[in-house]
Regions:
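N-terminal binding-site loop/beta-alpha segment at the start of enzyme catalytic domains
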Residues: 1-78, 297
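CE4/NodB-like, metal-dependent polysaccharide N-deacetylase domain
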Residues: 105-126, 146-149
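Structural motif corresponding to the early beta-alpha repeats
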Residues: 75-101
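Acidic (Asp/Glu)-rich catalytic clusters
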Residues: 8-11, 67-79, 114-118, 147, ...
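Alpha-helix N-cap and loop-to-helix initiation/capping positions
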Residues: 29-36, 59, 63, 97-105, ...
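Short, acidic/polar
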Residues: 28-41, 101-116, 165
Length: 298
């Protein structure tokens, strides 16, 4: 069973692995099939699910909600995360993709997510990306309104720099619960830019998206040395796959990230969560780092 972890001081308790529904519309599941899939990953202990208003051209939340309408009892077995703050041209009124983090939009978006997801509350709402026009006071007003109304229990951000995180936190009477960021052997800037250090300092656990590099790990020739090293480490650890080793590499970080799994295949989810049992050494971790970036530590 997947470990459970409190992700921040006074924050929610989530499963250590998170089920990501970004690509739900690509899985071509009926509502009944989706119910079965949800039941299967809940049985594995993956109880936290990750959504965003824009996923699937604004369709993924509603598709998930249709499944919950068929099995409403499943809602009490899961924690639902969603995001807002990006507007895309998938909606006719948007002539250009842009960010929107004003008070009314955040509230309206969260309320629409509740309708779409067939639930009465979100366990966590995130601002999806930093907005150059973000007024931190307005965001704080929206968060406080949603909290007081009982519609959202906890709040966080995604893809924020430490300075952006600190700015928003300075306006809030409660602790931000997470910063959902890209962490992968093929994307390592956050390891040294202070993002994960800030979260470790605050005892806040990041959520990690694109752990497998959006497929680059498997199909980019540049990362062949990384694939080779992952295969060697997989043999050393008796791991089932190089994917499993990547998840173990992320779990080794002291900020204690929660990896988001983006697959609609239950076997891949099962393999991913088994990475918790792998004990990666410090030298194995640095071998993987070097294979990905192409050079040794200074």
């Amino acid at each position: 069973m997947v470990q459970r972890i409190t992700i921040a001081p006074q924050g929610p308790e989530f499963s250590r692995f998170v089920m990501g529904y970004w690509r739900l519309m690509d899985w071509n599941m009926s509502s009944r099939q989706l119910v079965s899939f949800i039941e299967e990953h809940l049985e594995l202990g993956v109880t936290t699910v990750d959504h965003a208003d824009i996923y699937g051209g604004y369709q993924c939340e509603a598709a998930f909600g249709e499944a919950l309408k068929l099995a409403p009892h499943l809602r009490e077995r899961m924690e639902i995360v969603s995001k807002c703050g990006i507007a895309t041209t998938a909606r006719e009124e948007n002539v250009i993709g842009h960010y929107i983090t004003d008070r009314d939009h955040i509230i309206k978006s969260a309320e629409q997510s509740l309708v779409n997801l067939a639930t009465d509350r979100l366990d966590l709402l995130l601002i999806h990306r930093p907005d150059p026009l973000m007024d931190a006071d307005e965001v704080a007003e929206a968060f406080k309104h949603l909290l007081q109304s009982g519609k959202v229990r906890h709040f966080g951000v995604s893809n924020f720099t430490p300075a952006q995180f600190a700015l928003l936190q300075s306006r809030l009477p409660f602790t931000l619960a997470t910063n959902q960021v890209e962490i992968s052997p093929v994307h390592q800037p956050l390891l040294l830019d202070g993002t994960l250090d800030q979260l470790q300092q605050l005892r806040i656990r990041p959520m990690a998206w694109s752990c497998l590099g959006g497929g680059r790990l498997f199909n980019d020739d540049y990362f062949q040395p990384l694939r080779d090293e992952l295969a060697v480490v997989a043999e050393e650890l008796n791991a089932a796959s190089i994917e499993q080793v990547v998840y173990a590499w992320i779990l080794r970080l002291p900020s204690q990230p929660l990896p988001i799994i983006g697959s609609g295949k239950i076997e891949r989810i099962r393999f991913a969560v088994e990475a918790e049992a792998l004990k990666m050494t410090r030298q194995q971790w640095f071998r993987i780092r070097k294979a990905a970036i192409g050079y040794d530590v200074p």
